[in-house]
């Protein structure tokens, strides 16, 4: 299961966007899972222009 938000800070699953530098609502690529606060259900990674979400 992988979800994408758009480049310019789109609110996809997790509410993050790479347009805001891997940490618009979260705290960098190491944090900011579902809802943007790293609750452990999703692990975000930044691939180029898109956030990619996948389960741990």
Curated annotation (Swiss-Prot):
Superkingdom field: Eukaryota
Keyword Repeat carried by entry: yes
Entry keywords, A to Z: Keratin, Repeat
GO cellular component: cytosol; intermediate filament
Disulfide bonds: none
Presence of keyword Ion transport: no
Quaternary structure annotation from Swiss-Prot or TrEMBL: Interacts with hair keratins.
Function of the protein: In the hair cortex, hair keratin intermediate filaments are embedded in an interfilamentous matrix, consisting of hair keratin-associated proteins (KRTAP), which are essential for the formation of a rigid and resistant hair shaft through their extensive disulfide bond cross-linking with abundant cysteine residues of hair keratins. The matrix proteins include the high-sulfur and high-glycine-tyrosine keratins.
PANTHER family linked to this entry: KERATIN-ASSOCIATED PROTEIN 20-1, KERATIN-ASSOCIATED PROTEIN 20-2
Family under the similarity heading: Belongs to the KRTAP type 20 family.
Official protein name in the record: Keratin-associated protein 20-1
The organism of origin for this protein: Homo sapiens (Human)
């Amino acid at each position: 299961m992988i979800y994408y938000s758009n480049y310019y800070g789109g609110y996809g699953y997790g509410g993050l966007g790479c347009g805001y530098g891997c940490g618009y609502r979260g705290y960098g690529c190491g944090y900011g899972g579902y809802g943007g606060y790293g609750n452990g259900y999703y692990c975000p990674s930044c691939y180029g222009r898109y956030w990619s979400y996948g389960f741990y």
